[in-house]
Amino acid sequence: MICIIMGSESDLKIAEKAVNILKEFGVEFEVRVASAHRTPELVEEIVKNSKADVFIAIAGLAAHLPGVVASLTTKPVIAVPVDAKLDGLDALLSSVQMPPGIPVATVGIDRGENAAILALEILALKDENIAKKLIEYREKMKKKVYASDEKVKEMFK
């Protein structure tokens, strides 16, 4: 089970990238909105009551949500910094500069799909079915690149 928490509804497009991957893999998930700054009590309630094995925290600007989530659990937390201002660098730096002992894994700016894949890789450590699906997913990606290569080679003959 994966819990996706976004700092605001404006992060929905990023969350949808993660949700699409999780649906493709048939993994149980929940999606919530809670602000580290405006509703810290809701963040705590969600984290404390969630059955999630992994959390994905999506936030822009000051992006304290991933760190707050990490402070409330010993389960893995994956940050997705959002390009809201400053090309997302403010959110990226907020996510990667965590104090010792409170780690947050961080994927690229706006990369909800990579957060989902990383969460699945964590679950795959104990779930062979997910591990097999990840291998198949990578093979599919590989085939697309080979097909693109063939197409482009033909274009420039």
UniProtKB/Swiss-Prot annotation:
Pathway: Purine metabolism; IMP biosynthesis via de novo pathway; 5-amino-1-(5-phospho-D-ribosyl)imidazole-4-carboxylate from 5-amino-1-(5-phospho-D-ribosyl)imidazole (N5-CAIR route): step 2/2
Isomerase in keyword set: yes
Documented EC number(s): 5.4.99.18
Binding of substrate, residues: 8, 11, 38
One annotated GO molecular function: 5-(carboxyamino)imidazole ribonucleotide mutase activity
GO BP annotations listed: 'de novo' IMP biosynthetic process
Signal peptide extent: none
InterPro entries in UniProt: PurE_ClassI, PurE_dom, PurE_prokaryotes
The reaction(s) this protein catalyses: 5-carboxyamino-1-(5-phospho-D-ribosyl)imidazole + H(+) = 5-amino-1-(5-phospho-D-ribosyl)imidazole-4-carboxylate
Entry keywords, A to Z: Isomerase, Purine biosynthesis
Annotated Pfam families: AIRC
Chain's role: Catalyzes the conversion of N5-carboxyaminoimidazole ribonucleotide (N5-CAIR) to 4-carboxy-5-aminoimidazole ribonucleotide (CAIR).
Assigned protein family: Belongs to the AIR carboxylase family. Class I subfamily.
PANTHER family: PHOSPHORIBOSYLAMINOIMIDAZOLE CARBOXYLASE, PHOSPHORIBOSYLAMINOIMIDAZOLE CARBOXYLASE CATALYTIC SUBUNIT
Stated name of the protein: N5-carboxyaminoimidazole ribonucleotide mutase
